[in-house]
A protein has these predicted regions:
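Positively charged, low-complexity, intrinsically disordered RNA-binding extensions
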Residues: 140-244
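N-terminal cationic and glycine-rich segments that engage phosphates or anionic surfaces
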Residues: 1-126, 130-140, 239
Length: 244
């Protein structure tokens, strides 16, 4: 995981502002609905995909009442929300690799919108697999240590004992990586030890990074990420732009 920095390299769907927070909760709620419907259960102990989304929701400070209401809604016979998972891949300025994960009820609406963003601010949308080969799918758990109250060696030992692959200190946070199949078990084990998370989800982690030196390229890349992030169907955006 050398060189991977959650805060510098991953474009997330939640922000500090109330509007961003609300949008993030809406997107997570959509993920919960899909997880319940596809997993056939509202019990995270019997639905690993739901357990993964709940971990993400809790790390994003989504209230438990919201989570429960969304699960109940998904289980209700009157729920007609039908979303499908779609992944788009393309290139930003300077050949930056970009993966877009979306949940949509209308591919004919979503695909042209995503393609337009890539065409206007990047180098175009590519075929499936054109950039995903250069990413690794990993569970990533981030623990805030801004106050310095946590001991790095202790967190490392607890993470490895829980089944994590690695842990590294990244500025004010500890970043723990896991195999995707072990993610839920690691989250549960760390929660039982009293840890809370800044974020916790399955991510696409770049194998290498691209640095931009042109201000025009930086502006275009920033705009591309903003447009993707603000699209209601887009859940996650992963890229290999090495930001300062």
């Amino acid at each position: 995981m050398s060189g991977h920095s959650k805060w510098h390299n991953i474009q997330k769907t939640k922000g500090a502002a109330d509007a961003k927070r609300s949008a993030a909760f809406t997107k997570i709620a959509k993920e919960i609905i899909v997880a319940v419907k596809q997993g056939g259960s509202g019990d995270p102990n019997n639905n690993s995909r739901l357990a993964t989304v709940i971990a993400k929701a809790k790390a994003a400070n989504m209230p438990n009442d919201n989570i429960k209401r969304t699960i109940d809604k998904a289980l209700g016979s009157g729920n007609t929300d039908n979303y499908e998972s779609v992944t788009y891949e393309g290139y930003g300025p300077c050949g930056v690799a970009v993966i877009v994960e979306a949940l949509t009820d209308n591919r004919q609406r979503t695909a042209p919108e995503i393609r337009h963003y890539f065409d206007k601010f990047g180098k175009g949308m590519g075929a499936q697999g054109c950039v995903s080969w250069s990413f690794d799918r990993k569970g990533v758990i981030v623990i805030d240590n801004e106050e310095g109250e946590l001991d790095e060696d202790t967190v490392m030992m607890d993470a490895l004992d829980a089944g994590a692959e690695d842990m590294q200190a990244d500025g004010p946070v500890f970043e723990i990586t896991t195999d995707p199949d072990s993610f839920n078990d690691v989250v549960k084990a760390l929660e039982e030890k009293g840890y809370s998370f800044e974020s916790a989800e399955i991510e696409m982690v770049p194998q290498n990074y691209i640095v931009m030196t042109s201000e025009d390229d930086v502006r275009s890349m920033t705009k591309l990420l903003d447009m993707l992030d603000n699209n209601e169907d887009v859940q996650n955006v992963w890229h290999n732009w090495q930001q300062d």
